[in-house]
Amino acid sequence: MGNPRPRPMRLAEKLLQIRTGLGLSQTQMLERLGLGDTMHYGRISEYEQDKREPTLMTLLAYARAASVHLEDIVDDDFELPRKLPGNVNYRGINRKSRK
């Protein structure tokens, strides 16, 4: 079956950086992730304090919310951008289509 993957050592730090970089509270982060109906905001705190590891689907939601690659979040060798671009499609803001 293969070897288990090593746990990212900087995951909690990066998840906190994403939330604060987007200027969101923990409750707002849940809403931004689309998880407000299925998860309590305390779970965000557990992720940020390295008390719980998020699921792959949650990590993908973080990557979408911050408009970064999943590898930027889970690979300790990659850094998140200082200024997060955020999701330009969030709340009805649409990108201009290229012709």
PLM segments and residue spans:
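Short alpha-helical "recognition helix" segments of helix-turn-helix
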Residues: 29-33, 62
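Recognition helix of helix-turn-helix/homeodomain-like DNA-binding domains
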Residues: 34-53
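Residue-level recognition of specific faces of alpha-helices
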Residues: 14, 43-46, 72
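DNA major-groove recognition helix of helix-turn-helix/homeodomain DNA-binding modules
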Residues: 51, 55-72
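A short, Lys/Arg-rich alpha-helix, primarily the initiator
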Residues: 1-22
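Key DNA-contact positions within bacterial/archaeal DNA-binding proteins
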Residues: 27, 38, 42, 71
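Short, charged recognition helix plus adjacent turn
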Residues: 2-5, 64, 74-99
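Residue-level signal for the short linker/turn that defines the boundary of a DNA-recognition helix
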Residues: 10-13, 23-24, 39, 54-57
